[in-house]
Amino acid sequence: MASTTPNFDAIVIGAGFSGMYMLKSLRDSLGLNVRVFEAGGTVGGTWYWNRYPGARCDSDSYIYCFTFDKQLLQEWEWSERYPEQPEIMRYLEHVAHRHDLKRDMQFNTRVTGAEFDESTDAWAVHTDRGDLVTARYLIAAVGSLSHTNMPAFKGLETFTGTWYHTSRFPQAGVDFTGKRVGVVGTGATAVQAIPEIAQQAKHLTVFQRTANYCVPARNGKVDPEVVKARKADYDGVVRRIRESFFGQEHYFIPKSVLETTPEERE
């Protein structure tokens, strides 16, 4: 390296929930000079990439949010128990604007490599746009839900129809009206997408290798009185989810399933 003074105190890879929080904490709480590199066109992480029909959160909305802004916890109103992708994106964009996070973010930029130089005690970070920047700290907030798992199907390159991958769905959406559609897989993503596509498609075929266990979502509007009670006890909510094994207000039933009757198990 030509200089022993890093360009930044810290570089964060990714601008999803974790990357946004890291920037907020390092910059505003610790006073560090931070740069975030994000491959997508804006904040959101997995919610930026996964915009397939029916994409929504599977955690209760009142805990699927940042807790560092207590005023925002009181102000923000979620429309459903499990909000859809567009609503989550609106929330993340609002947080980014409210806390001026984007001024320290560089979008449409993918980190391609990083090396630690022991002689200068700094990281050298390379991007696909030709950047070479240095930092004392490097934080990978890349997540685990946005990398495309593209199946190696024979003949995919010569298929004359149109095909899509749920993690790279067109931003403008797709109109399946009158179409014959095939969906490969019945995992968590397909469970959300299939019912939505079925409402439009002329014919839908689902290809399933292994059956997966699903529970009813029981989604819907949240009782205003329940919302009011949660907002009045957000400190308690945060404490309980941090103490919970699941990170949510759900707990183990302290007995074996074999101790229950068949009716209870159902």
Which stretches of residues belong to each language-model region?
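Residues that flank catalytic or metal-binding motifs in active/ligand-binding sites
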Residues: 43, 62, 110, 121, ...
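Beta1-alpha1 glycine-rich phosphate/pyrophosphate-binding loop at the start
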Residues: 8-102, 208-209
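Conserved beta-strand scaffold positions in the cores of enzyme catalytic domains, especially
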Residues: 63, 105-106, 161-164
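Feature captures the FAD/FMN-dependent oxidoreductase FAD-binding
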Residues: 78-145
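Rossmann-like dinucleotide-binding core of oxidoreductases
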Residues: 3-7, 11-17, 22-36, 40-42, ...
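Short Asp/Glu-rich motifs
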Residues: 46, 115, 216-217
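Residue-level detector of flexible, active-site-proximal loop/helix-junction positions
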Residues: 70, 112, 118, 170-171, ...
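Short low-complexity, flexible loop/linker segments enriched in glycine and/or proline
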Residues: 50-51, 120-121, 220-223
